[in-house]
Amino acid sequence: MNQIRSITSALRTLNGLQNYEHSRPSSVNEEDDHYPGLSNEDTPLKVFHPQNPNGAVLVLYPGASAKGEAHPKMITLARSIAVNGIQVYIPRIPPLIDLKLSKSILEWTVHFYRWLKTQPGHENSPINLAGISFGGVIVLKACLDPFLLQQPPKSVIVFGTSYNVKTSMEFMYNGRIDHNGNIIKLTPDPWSVIVLFHNYLNQVDVGYPTNGVQKVLQLMVRDQDDQAQALIEDLVGEEKVLIKDIIELNMSDEFNRIMGIFFRDCADQIEFISPKYWCKNISNEVYILHGTNDTLSPFTESIKLDSELSNSHLLISGIFKHRVLSSEMSIFSKWKETLKIIKFLSKYYRGGLLP
């Protein structure tokens, strides 16, 4: 019976990912709520209440995006899971809204988990955790927090996350993925490089002023692209060349020189967000899902992550891009990949989300 329920749940989730971005399932009530932040300030929180709850709870942590908990793809995913009777929470993590990859993100992540464990009905109930992209990195890091070691989540799943920031950035330079000697070429999305420069350019000395570049990056991470473009037009000299290298992913000598400065002078911060340096200490059962067509983080990052974790389940699928389902597949390939997804999600539902 549990096998049938898990397969049905997986099918509902896949159906939701294709249909729930622009429509709400009638079996799920959505609520804009709030929770007390680190300083007890009201912090936005989206809650998805199934009409027929099965008692399972999932916290879905967003990636680095100005849209945060309101990101359409996050909401689609939450709906697609909640239709199976699972109560889903998407908390705002304020530093991620500002695209600041600081250690405070971990504090907020653990803080919300602790707060949720104090809420009526959740005090003694197991909670499942999920993280998207950079949110996945922080969920993994949170598993090593003393509170989560004492009261661990029932299951952990990460989507499109990275293993080593440095190797992820190498993919951004050239779009090359070397998988078992096979070279795969993709056109990278510059978002990860934009976020990296947004975080570290103001912390290093590159030999000339970069205030203009920093202002452009601030506008870009806030999705203010028109204002950013206008400011780019006003830049001159080294700053103009640098911002074009960043947004066009030109692997110039100057671009590589500055990246080298980041990895040298900001090493501690970068290691903090690179599971390579600490994931071996994670004992939780972790489900890892990554798309072969992901242009933000290469799928080989998840393969490396899986090899270092002691208790993990991995699926690399051609049907997924970073946050969406791919339409660039033959019907036969799509059916084959769909069956793999159903098998993987069924195992995940049995391991955490089904009572």
What positions do the PLM features span?
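N-terminal cap/lid segment of alpha/beta-hydrolase-fold proteins
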Residues: 3-56
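Short, surface-exposed "cap/lid" segments of acyl-processing enzymes
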Residues: 49-84, 90-93
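Catalytic nucleophile-loop/oxyanion-hole region of alpha/beta-hydrolase
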Residues: 70-77, 92-128, 138, 143-146
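Alpha/beta-hydrolase-fold enzymes
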Residues: 144-237
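Conserved alpha/beta-hydrolase "acid-adjacent" motif
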Residues: 270-271, 295-301
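Short beta-strand/loop motif that positions the catalytic acidic residue
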Residues: 282, 288-290, 294
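Catalytic active-site module of serine/aspartate enzymes centered on a nucleophile-bearing elbow/loop
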Residues: 325-355
